């Protein structure tokens, strides 16, 4: 860290979550040894940021696929890779339907042609969490949108274009690929997004409860078939190329006839993500208790701090036998200068 977190905040969160975290400043980190480095996610910028610490890691990490960055690795993080996995999923489970597979477009003319047929969603190849996404109604692409798309095509080379689906539920399957490239299923994630696909929050609940929410639309058997096939596809595609956490975003949608369908590979996030955070948080809740994890942002000085203080008063944290029963807790320290806070609401909000 660049600055040590507030001591009282760290101590109070250690009491709630039983964690013994020891943040270190950049200066001290240069003097320490590490078994490995596990940032939120890897990118050229993060590799450069941590370059001086790599030599202080053990040999196993220094020789691993995650220790260096190359242009070949860049495509692993693209929407093209998600489309590749989705295509294999549809081939294995034909009832998913080919019309959910995105098209790769290299020119504005190709995008216009698809726009004339139906409502579309256009996505930049390297973007996530609702960023770099344009929703274009059938035949109504604007000059401003064409300008934005031209910029993306110029900088990134292509875009992915898909049919706009009537979204009913956003969810994900969370995994970890170990050093031997075995894929381990961690659990489900049910999350909320804005109309434009930007992340808003996660439901924090037991895995069986989350599976039940999703299975209302898919049936438990079909949902597990999706998971089994996804594990095969992801293992094959990323074997020998990636180690760490990853999440596959999915969607339940309603088609023109009122039937529910599933898009089983909207996006692949090769990093920690909010779903994995939510799975970790659930372990601290009493059995059968559920909550909501979200990120609250405000550009106004003092507003975040005021909101946190209000929530603490309105929803006091209640714990029994070391587990959270109800209430509110901010998961990041706040001050008057804070612009965001990660927070957890437990029980009835």
Task: List where the protein language model places each region.
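Phosphate-binding site of ATP-dependent enzymes
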Residues: 118, 143-200, 251-265, 273
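Glycine-rich phosphate-binding loop of ATP-grasp-fold ATP-dependent ligases
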Residues: 100-104, 119-146, 172, 195-214
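ATP-grasp fold ATP-binding core
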Residues: 105, 114-137, 151-167, 248, ...
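Peripheral (often C-terminal) accessory segments that flank ATP-dependent C-N-forming ligase machineries
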Residues: 286-349
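A short catalytic or substrate-binding loop motif that flags glycine-/basic-rich loops and adjacent residues
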Residues: 126-127, 165-169, 240-244, 334-337
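A long amphipathic alpha-helix within ATP-dependent nucleotide-binding catalytic cores
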Residues: 154-156, 163, 185, 198-260, ...
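ATP-dependent carboxylate/phosphate-activation module, predominantly the ATP-grasp catalytic core
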Residues: 175-232, 269-296
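Conserved N-proximal alpha/beta basic substrate-recognition cap immediately N-terminal to
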Residues: 3-113, 127-128
């Amino acid at each position: 860290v660049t600055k040590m977190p507030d001591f009282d905040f760290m101590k109070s969160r250690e009491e709630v979550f039983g964690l013994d975290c020891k943040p270190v400043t950049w200066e001290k980190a240069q003097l320490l040894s590490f078994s490995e480095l596990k940032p939120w996610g890897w990118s050229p910028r993060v590799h450069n940021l941590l370059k001086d610490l790599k030599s202080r890691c053990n040999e196993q990490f220094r020789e691993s696929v995650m220790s260096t960055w190359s242009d070949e690795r860049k495509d692993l993080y693209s929407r093209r890779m998600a489309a590749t996995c989705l295509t294999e999923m549809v081939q294995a489970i034909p009832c998913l339907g080919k019309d959910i597979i995105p098209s790769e477009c290299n020119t504005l003319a190709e995008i216009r042609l698809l726009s004339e047929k139906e409502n579309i969603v256009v996505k930049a190849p390297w973007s996530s969490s609702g960023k770099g996404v344009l929703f274009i109604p059938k035949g109504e692409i604007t000059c401003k949108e064409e300008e934005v798309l031209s910029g993306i095509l110029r900088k990134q080379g292509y875009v992915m274009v898909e049919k706009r689906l009537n979204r009913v539920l956003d969810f994900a399957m969370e995994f970890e690929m170990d050093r031997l490239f075995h894929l381990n299923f961690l659990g489900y994630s049910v999350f909320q997004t804005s109309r434009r696909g930007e992340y808003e929050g996660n439901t924090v609940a037991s895995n069986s409860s989350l599976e039940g929410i999703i299975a209302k639309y898919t049936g438990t058997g079909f949902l597990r078939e999706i998971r089994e096939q996804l594990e095969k596809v992801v293992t094959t595609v990323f074997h020998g190329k990636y180690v760490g956490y990853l999440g596959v975003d999915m969607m339940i949608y309603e088609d023109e006839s009122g039937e529910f369908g599933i898009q089983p590979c909207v996006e692949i996030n090769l990093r920690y993500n909010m779903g994995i955070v939510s799975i970790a948080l659930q372990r601290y809740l009493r059995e059968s208790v559920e909550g909501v994890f979200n990120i609250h942002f405000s550009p106004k000085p003092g507003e975040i701090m005021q909101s946190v203080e209000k929530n603490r008063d309105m929803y006091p944290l209640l714990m029994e036998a070391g587990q959270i029963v109800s209430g509110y807790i901010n998961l990041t320290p706040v001050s008057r200068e804070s612009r965001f806070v990660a927070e957890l609401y437990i029980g009835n909000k």
